[in-house]
């Protein structure tokens, strides 16, 4: 197999992985679980310091297994019940008794959370204490990337800042473009990429859960009611929007099921998966074709998102849905050129969507970007595309660079303003 393809598979396996619960509070739970393990006993106090963006994305989302919202319960639950070896599934097993113990720690004023000044977008430092013993765990650059561990003030592990690599820079130094992703997905041996089919299984179960039970705003179930009442039809567009939103409903509502995440985001993993799976069902393609389309969607999303910080004022579901739309064109028998048209169309349609934290209404944003993916792939199949208008260039690679430039240079102050509004 080509070395370039091996790199691509390595990238996907690094950042397309199961995650239980919204990844920002789960980062705090993971850090707390590692700190508890380092301490050797359950702590009697926990101090949490996080970056503004991690704080923003933890304010309104439920922590799985707890029925509660926020960083304090995430950290306390991680320290009491977390599995430090489980990564983003750190809270996969937690009992009501452990939740009560975590809440008691919070009620006693023994868990503190504060924002801290840092240049890192993903940053979480947890200090766990028991008597005169103290363990510090610092996460930096990625939701499970441990940068430092200290026990009683002594360093037991550290990563040099020049060696640390944030998840957002995962494509740095890699020969990768939309065209190379497209060719790779079409030509790589099926056996090498079969693993991606787990995304369909995990995110499909989340969607089923969101349809079966009331979570969050019940976006998916509301659409189902509209179909049952004859107000809207059960066509491909509405089915994609309904089932994608339902998975996000369940995830944001604290369902105790993992999502197959994409670059640290469960919702974006959902957006990269479910529209592609439903399109594959519509066109009755083989399992192999579905796997190739999922690889195209997930790696395409990773590549586009590598052009800007992992957390920002920009809602990443937009570009994730652009990559999904590219894969949908492939499933429908369209050309590479038409797949590029789909990316251009989605970015033109919904690139103004901001991120104002992880919460129940994220399901609405997921449904918005997924509906754009359907419209855009249909337009692309008819060779209708946005080109040379606004931030959309005549070339898809230039458009992707424009998105990165807009976010890096134009949206940092937007992010600050959003966080200030949310914290007021």
Swiss-Prot record:
- Domain of life, per UniProt, equals Bacteria
Can you tell me which family this protein belongs to? Answer: Belongs to the UPF0597 family.
Q: What is this protein called?
A: UPF0597 protein Shew185_3080
Q: What GO annotations for molecular function exist for this entry?
A: L-cysteine desulfhydrase activity
Q: Which residues form a coiled coil?
A: none
- Which InterPro entries does this entry report, sorted A to Z? Ser_deHydtase-like_asu (IPR005130), UPF0597 (IPR021144)
Q: Its GO biological process terms?
A: L-cysteine catabolic process to pyruvate
